[in-house]
Amino acid sequence: MLGVAAQRRGDHVAAIAWFRRALVSMPHDAGLCIGLGISLFEVEEVDEALILLRRACELAPALAPAWFNYGKALEKQARMEDAAVALQRALDLDPSHISTRLSLARAQVSLGRIETAVAGFREVLRRDPDNAEAWFGLSNLNTFQFNAADAARLQRAFGRKDRTAEDRELLGSALAKALEAQGDYVHAFEIFRDVKASQRQRVKGSAAGEQRRVQTIARTFAQALPAPLDVQLGQEVILIISLPRSGSTLVEQILASHPQVEGANEIRDMQLVVDAEARRRGSAFPLWVPEATAEDWHRLGSEYLARTAHWRKTKPRFTDKNLLNWYLVGASMTMLPAARAVMVRRDPLETCLACYRQYFTGNAGFACDLDDMADYCINFMRLTRFWLEKFPTRIFDLQYETLIADPEATIRRLLAFCGLSFDPACLAFHRTSRAVLSTPSAAQVRQPLRQDTARSALYGDKLDRLRQRLREAGLPERDPKPEALL
């Protein structure tokens, strides 16, 4: 079928046209509904995609792929309870489908059902002992620890020469963490380094380009900005800004424990609004910023609020957490003059090491080399200092170590800054039942604050160059002490 062929080569616009044409003559074909739904989802037509995928389930309730694709779409929309139900239905219909088992286990992680998730990953490994995604899924649970038998099995799987580069990277990442659990940090570091070197060949990233980007953003927003048309626009929004592995998931969990706040997890709406404006003007961000009028910024803020309205159906406030938000603080503050932002910053050395240890999917070239990670961290610190000076009354500077040392006082100040009354549920954030899509932290936020997981000292002189780079940039290492890695 031409629609399937277009879909396989990534041309979803063409696939949509073919599937629509075919559905005119075969409106009750579940396969066509699935195909069209998948391609619509890829081009961000989410509402129609979900309708079609649900329609496929209704047309063919005994068709496992219908439930699987519907579950995957729900998962991407953070509807994790519904996703788990659909994926379980798919698994009941086809227990042999490994991808369904993996997806269901990941959904259970997000829902905090960690024991069930571990059992799901283990069942995959019983059926497919060297499955890279299952091993990685277990390693990505930061509350899970491999045993010696796991380490031996991972060593054998990693040593196979017939695996794809991505499978070897997933297995290597899991193996390194298994070696850490056995106290073998020298070998673990070697494996992390090999994994990152392999990944670096496939991902983009330029330290010089990143520095130019940061400098251009700061220079652009150093200029005067138009006065807002509506000073109340965006009062629903709490932006969360941080590097990866710095505590943003924990801070969101604390805020989402408040009865007036919905935790939206990582959403891309701000980036999508800014990108759409760049396309409309034919000028990349931030080059179009000096030309934007107060009316333009008001329009962009209204578009963002319309895109995120579904997060305010039951609660008046919501969090916007995205690891690219730090580039967009100036745009966010200007288009949403009543929005508040929380800047989460953590010890730079621990942050860089945590990112280096983490296997990121997608384009995360900054984390493939410790020098690149240092550059990225330094650029983040410089730009966020600029934002704090530019918007001093609208950004809460939250030092992660302070939160760990004195949680109640820090949480009280955080809530007051956000215009929220104190609620004890925010102190007992680990009891809050909600989907957490940041898998490395999904298990940790179900527990009280941890005091025993600092790692930089364990790697000794392996991090000496990183320490030197950070010191030269004016980012000295804090006194080593236990802290949580979220």
Set out the residue ranges of the language-model regions.
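PAPS-dependent sulfotransferases, especially Golgi type II membrane carbohydrate sulfotransferases
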Residues: F136-S139, A151-D162, L171-G234, F285-A294, ...
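Phosphate-binding active sites in nucleotide-utilizing proteins
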Residues: V231-T334, R340
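Helix-start (N-cap) detector for alpha-helical repeat units in TPR-like alpha-solenoids
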Residues: H12, A30-G31, A64-P65, I98-S99, ...
